[in-house]
Curated annotation (Swiss-Prot):
Its EC number is 1.6.5.-. This is Ferroptosis suppressor protein 1. The modification by 4-hydroxy-2-nonenal (HNE) adduction in mitochondria results in loss of the oxidoreductase activity and activation of a novel function in mitochondrial oxidative stress signaling. Keywords: Acetylation, Cell membrane, Cytoplasm, FAD, Flavoprotein, Lipid droplet, Lipoprotein, Membrane, Mitochondrion, Myristate, Nucleus, Oxidoreductase, Transmembrane, Transmembrane helix, Ubl conjugation. It catalyses: ubiquinone-10 + NADH + H(+) = ubiquinol-10 + NAD(+); phylloquinone + NADH + H(+) = phylloquinol + NAD(+); menaquinone-4 + NADH + H(+) = menaquinol-4 + NAD(+); menadione + NADH + H(+) = menadiol + NAD(+). It comes from Mus musculus. Its main location: other. Induction: Expression is up-regulated in mouse embryonic fibroblasts by genotoxic reagents 5-fluorouracil and etoposide. Up-regulated in cardiac cells by anticancer drug doxorubicin. A NAD(P)H-dependent oxidoreductase that acts as a key inhibitor of ferroptosis. At the plasma membrane, catalyzes reduction of coenzyme Q/ubiquinone-10 to ubiquinol-10, a lipophilic radical-trapping antioxidant that prevents lipid oxidative damage and consequently ferroptosis. Acts in parallel to GPX4 to suppress phospholipid peroxidation and ferroptosis. This anti-ferroptotic function is independent of cellular glutathione levels. Binds 6-hydroxy-FAD non-covalently. GO terms for cellular component: cytoplasm; cytosol; lipid droplet; mitochondrial membrane; mitochondrial outer membrane; mitochondrion; nucleus; plasma membrane.
């Protein structure tokens, strides 16, 4: 798809809402094809949040995880918050009154969750980087740290802390017994547990934090008491929450109320078109596809959405998206990891080479056609 589109693009203007992994992949492809587009995001920089947890333990790392949109997309980027979509007039409505017309719309709004795993604030690049540098200082001050939530973010967070600061006491509290994501092979989930135990992480499984709302988050305190529903009490200096990921649906919720899945994702057909709309696509976390929410999948969705916009312009058949066997790599600190590729177990060496060392940062800088600092 590297050559430019030869049909008349005068009537075509694609608006992409959300500049996460799916959004920048779609924007880069449209730019290469010379298809008119506008990318909208409330931040001024792409956040490579796959590496967010390392940025919260290693000073100087965060600057590699934020990449300027305007340096890549120039006038095809608009910083702003989308507050609604006018389907009748084909307009994306921004806070402040601006309206962006579209012939085709790609919704790539992603998901939100607690800092440091996600950073979803209206912010400039410098302030975002500083938020992670401040987090590093809080972790460095704390001898005892509790991580709440044993999904992939929680286990990676605990592993990153123990890799960078092996002398710290880290306790991971998880409401279930198996760790990481339920779609993973049982042997992968077991290896996650063994890696954490080898690193010296204390595991409190099948327990739920009962006083979470009262606890300070991401800040050093001389004494914090964490209580669980089983009556366990843990004394700590710092609490990091790594659960509660939600789909970012506020931009489109009112326009597509009848097209929403129970979690707020958009119901799509096999071509990733929002049900009932041939010119509107949903990709990444906000698409209701039967697969885990991952950056890798968002990129695959972007390929299909862009191909289908081009195919529709050329009156060609549309391309269907077919989820494959699961590829999922868990980085457990820079020297360790485990996962599966196309449904098959892969161990430490492969994951370390493929992901753990640089957490795929170079891939995002390449997509954005910029050089890392």
């Amino acid at each position: 798809m590297g050559s430019q589109v030869s049909v008349d693009t005068g009537a075509v203007h694609v608006v992409i809402v959300g500049g996460g992994f799916g959004g920048i992949a779609a924007a880069s492809q449209l730019q290469a094809l010379n298809v008119p587009f506008m990318l909208v995001d409330m931040k001024d920089s792409f956040h490579h949040n796959v590496a967010a947890l390392r940025a919260s333990v290693e000073s100087g790392f965060a600057k590699k995880t934020f990449i300027s949109y305007s340096a890549t997309f120039k006038d095809n980027f608009r910083q702003g918050k989308v507050i609604g979509i006018d389907l009748k007039n084909r307009m994306v409505l921004l806070q402040g009154g601006e309206a962006l017309p579209f012939s085709h719309l790609i919704l790539a709004t992603g998901s939100t969750g607690p800092f440091p795993g996600k950073f979803n604030e209206v912010s400039c690049q410098q302030a975002a980087i500083q938020a992670y540098e401040d987090m590093v200082k809080q972790i460095q001050r704390s001898q005892f740290i509790v991580v709440v939530g044993g999904g992939s973010a929680g286990v990676e967070m605990a592993a990153e802390i123990k890799t960078e600061y092996p002398e710290k006491e880290v306790t991971l509290i998880h409401s279930r017994v198996p760790l990481a994501d339920k779609e993973l092979l049982p042997c992968v989930r077991q290896e996650v547990k063994e890696i954490l135990l080898r690193k010296g992480v204390q595991l409190l499984l099948s327990e739920r934090v009962s006083n979470l709302e009262e606890l300070p988050r991401n800040e050093y305190r001389e004494y914090i008491k964490v209580e669980t529903d089983k009556g366990t009490e843990v004394a700590t200096n710092m609490v990091i929450v790594c659960n509660g990921i939600k789909i970012n649906s506020s931009a489109y919720r009112s326009a597509f109320e009848s097209r929403l899945a129970s979690n707020g994702a958009l119901k799509v057909n096999e071509f990733l078109q929002v049900e009932g709309y041939s010119n509107i696509y949903a990709i990444g976390d906000c698409a209701d596809t039967k697969e885990p929410k991952m950056a890798y999948h968002a990129g695959l969705h972007a390929n299909v959405a862009v191909a289908n916009i081009v195919n529709s312009m050329k009156q060609r058949p549309l391309k269907a998206y077919k989820p494959g066997a699961l590829t999922f790599l868990l980085s457990m600190g820079r020297n360790d990891g485990v996962g599966q590729i196309s449904g098959f177990y892969v161990g430490r060496l492969m994951v370390r080479l493929a992901k753990s060392r640089d957490l795929l940062i170079s891939t995002s800088w390449k997509t954005m056609r910029q050089s890392p600092p």
